[in-house]
Amino acid sequence: LLRSNAKKEDDIWVTGELGLAALGLAKLQKKIQLPQGLSKKAIGALEKPMLQSSIIEIMAKLSHSAIDISDGLIADLSHILEASKVGADISLKDVPVTPWLKKNKLIDIGLSGGDDYQLLFTAPKKNRNKINLVSKMPSIKITRIGSIKKGKSLNISDHKGMLYKLKKKGYDHFETK
């Protein structure tokens, strides 16, 4: 699957839960305090990510484009949008961010943290039911988070439908310090 094949009106999907690995990194860097159980889970997500390899072949048949989430959801979605010359609308309430991040109002970590190694893909609406069936497989979580649109903007709406302003887009390999 290519990054450059997202089509207008495709659904946008992600696998798994986002933000755990970024929490693990923040914990190891002593930037955050976490409850013991979450700390262990977060560090585990960073050090041994659970790759969704069991569904790659199935998704290849149902999807137009895909990328793994290594730089953060928004950064990696931006790679698809740029390569496909399209835009997107994302619903923040639908993004499967680690519940602790939502509870502590740290949702940006789940959107831009990186190292999740989950799959981000676009698929035609006609495949929605098939993808939902795949998501019922044991240990597979797939969530629809938005849609592809004409244009080049990426809009993230909050739970009230208002535009959400993200502080950091994600990891930049060429960022100068």
Give each language-model segment a name.
Residues L1-K177:
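Helix-biased detector of long, well-ordered alpha-helical tracts
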